[in-house]
Amino acid sequence: AGFETQITYQPVKAPAALPVRPPILCAGCMHRTAMYAMKKVFRDGIFPSDIGCYTLGIQLGTVDTTICMGASITVAAGMSLAGETRDIVCTIGDSTFLHTGIQGLINAVYNGANITVVILDNRITAMTGHQPNPTTGLTACGVATPAVSIEAVCRASGATFVETGSPNDLVTFIDVLKSARSLKGVKVIIARQPCVISEKRAKIVRGHYTVHQDLCIGCKACIKFGCP
């Protein structure tokens, strides 16, 4: 036996002018700022990417390929060695770099690729639940352990340029990207800023940002930036 219910509803048509709302990065995520800077410096570049939160950078125009963990660097190197002359800038997270990115970096250096590698180091393995990784100095059980230096690994791999910067210092970070762009070979930029979710859990309080309706001029910079 069963029963039926009568539902009364009125269909509603959405306004035609509503913008598309695709999945985006978290509010305050440093990946957004890093990718915004990348797009400003490498305007006509090619952007192979990897598996992580930063895959959502596709909405910012800085993710052209995503295949599997570690493929960003190897795809970038392959494009360079195949004769691509445009800027090739790949993105990979700190966890993924340690998982399967180091081999690709060594291969790119060994074979003479001309690429820029941006390692998005948010100090945690964020996408799968904020687990620690070898760069954090903690084991999965929270026990202190020696931390791996991404800078040291990259220099040992033979990268011609290794610099670290915070995307939150946008002007300085853009200058680092420009310096890398002016050089040949395998250049590595480590974009380091803690995951904003981890910061919130650590009770690091930030202010709330809103659009000031009286000052807004409709330039749509916030939309281009992917501001949530």
Question: Can you say where each PLM-predicted feature lies in the sequence?
Answer:
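Active-site diphosphate/adenylate-binding microenvironment
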Residues: 7-73, 82-85
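Short glycine-rich anion-binding loops that position phosphate/pyrophosphate groups of nucleotides
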Residues: 53, 193-196
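Thiamine diphosphate
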Residues: 58-188, 201
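Generic long, charged, amphipathic alpha-helical segments
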Residues: 207-215
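Terminal amphipathic helices with adjacent charged low-complexity linkers/tails
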Residues: 1-8, 191, 207
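Cys/His-rich Zn2+-binding cysteine-cluster or related metal-binding knuckle/ribbon modules and their
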Residues: 196, 203-208
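Iron-sulfur cluster-binding cysteine motifs and their immediate structural context
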Residues: 217-228
